[in-house]
Every structure is written in C-alpha cells, then in structure tokens.
Amino acid sequence: MDDPTFVWRAPIGTVVLIALALRDRARTGTWSRARELGVLFGAALGAMAYALAHDAVTWSISREYFSIGKGLPEAATSFAPVARLALLAGWSAGLAVGLALVIANNPGRLSRLPERALAPELGRVVAYALLGAGTCAALGAASEPCLGVAIADAGVLSPRSYLVAQGAHAGSYLGAALGAAVSVARVRRARRWLSERRPSPSPGPSAVA
C-alpha cells in the first residue's frame, strides 16, 4: 500500500479527469461529467479524512498493530507512516465507492438522480464503516482468550489492544463494502421510482389519426 508513485499519479490523474470534464462540457454544453467527477473526488476526500481519523484512533490503541501487523517498524514512534498509509487506502477506497455510485446512477432507460442526491449515500457508507469498525473492534477484544496467546507468540506485548485495532480495521472495510452495496441498491430503486412516475410522452398527431 505504501506506493511512492502516488505523489505524482494522483495529480496527473486529477488533471486528466478535469480535462475530460472540460471536453465533455465543450461537446455537450452540460457539466454532467464534471458533476460525476465531483462525486468521485468527494468520495475520495471523504474516505481519506475518515481513514486518517480512524487510523489515528487505532494507532493510539495499538502501535504494535502497525509496527508488527502492517510491517511499519517506524510506526512504533511516529504517526507519519500510518498517516501516509491511511491516505493511500482512503483514496483508493473512496474512488471505488464513488465510482460504484456514479455507475449505479448512469443514464439508461431509468431516470437519473441529480448528483447531489448521492451525497447522503456517501454518508451512509461512512456510517456503515463506523458501525462495522465498532462491532469488529468489540469482537476483537472478545477474541483475546482464544487468539491472545498466538498474537503474543508473534512478539506482541499487548494482544488485546492489537486485536481491537485489527478488528476495527477489518470492520471498517466490511462495513464500507456493505454500505456501498446498500447505497447502490437504494440509488437503483430511487431511479426506478422516478421512472415509474415520469409522465409518458403524449402521442403525436399521426398516432392520434
């Protein structure tokens, strides 16, 4: 996950996407592609903020989870490598969620939702991620009697804290995946609802005759 190319790939990718949005504006006269990009970047930035806050909490709970479990020995004394890892993971996960919502709202036979209607669904994904993190963190703590010895044998001094942090990370991913699936289903259902209530086109004069 610690990709040194990210520092130049992300800006270049951003410029390319903006250029595509401007070209689409010139060709169609609308900002539909730009609004879709707004959803993507909003999801990515939101996920990065969540990941940074989440990892700050789990790092405070168990530095060993990062220094041993994630293979970041410098994380034992510094949050910097943890923050870098969080931003990378958040960027990728956020783009994936945003892309799923944009595709679910892609034009077709169904009516399209305005992009602003997707914002609550992004919030729903975050809520599911938080719920998953809390639930799995509790399960991690409860698993100490079963897994604590094995974790300690790996050199971990505080197995319970390690398992709590590990559970929180697994739960965040599971919760976000479930939340994204629910949100995609909700977007599709909302589009069907709009389509069913869309007035049918009036028949032309030739059809009436």
Task: Annotate each PLM feature.
Residues A26-G46, R116-A129, A181, A185-R186:
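Alpha-helical transmembrane segments and their helix-start/interface "positive-inside/aromatic belt" motifs
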Residues E64-F79:
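Perimembrane loop-to-helix junctions flanking transmembrane segments
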Residues R192-A209:
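Short, highly charged, low-complexity non-transmembrane loops/tails of multi-pass membrane proteins
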Residues L72-E74, L147-A165:
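Short, membrane-exposed interhelical loops at transmembrane-helix boundaries
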